[in-house]
Amino acid sequence: MSTYAIIKTGGKQVKVEVGQAIYVEKIDAEAGAEVTFNEVVLVGGDKTVVGTPIVEGATVVGTVEKQGKQKKVVTFKYKPKKGSHRKQGHRQPYTKIVIDAINA
């Protein structure tokens, strides 16, 4: 059974394994930089360790592959018979990270 972990980042919990690429909310780091996640909620594998609320001493290390923006989401507000309408677009920034190691 391969080792996996559940980490908290960007207000969400993400299940990660070594070698996996994940997309998370934007992290201020350049492409190629190393990122360490200290908020590890669970480490699983042969022996599962559940944190209360986090696992002490456990870290997940990853490398930033790229920074980007998601596809555009368009919102449109319209009031009939008033000639009022409003169109707005938004692109959420993200960071793509490749997981290098899970240290428990």
Curated annotation (Swiss-Prot):
Pfam families hit by this protein: Ribosomal_L21p
A biological process from GO: translation
Coiled-coil region(s): none
GO MF annotations, alphabetized: rRNA binding; structural constituent of ribosome
Annotated keywords: Ribonucleoprotein, Ribosomal protein, RNA-binding, rRNA-binding
Signal peptide region: none
InterPro entries membership: bL21-like (IPR028909), bL21-like_sf (IPR036164), Ribosomal_bL21 (IPR001787), Ribosomal_bL21_CS (IPR018258)
Highest rank taxon of the organism: Bacteria
Disulfide bonds: none
Transmembrane segments: none
GO cellular component: cytoplasm; ribonucleoprotein complex; ribosome
Family: Belongs to the bacterial ribosomal protein bL21 family.
Function: This protein binds to 23S rRNA in the presence of protein L20.
Record's subunit section: Part of the 50S ribosomal subunit. Contacts protein L20.
This protein's name: Large ribosomal subunit protein bL21
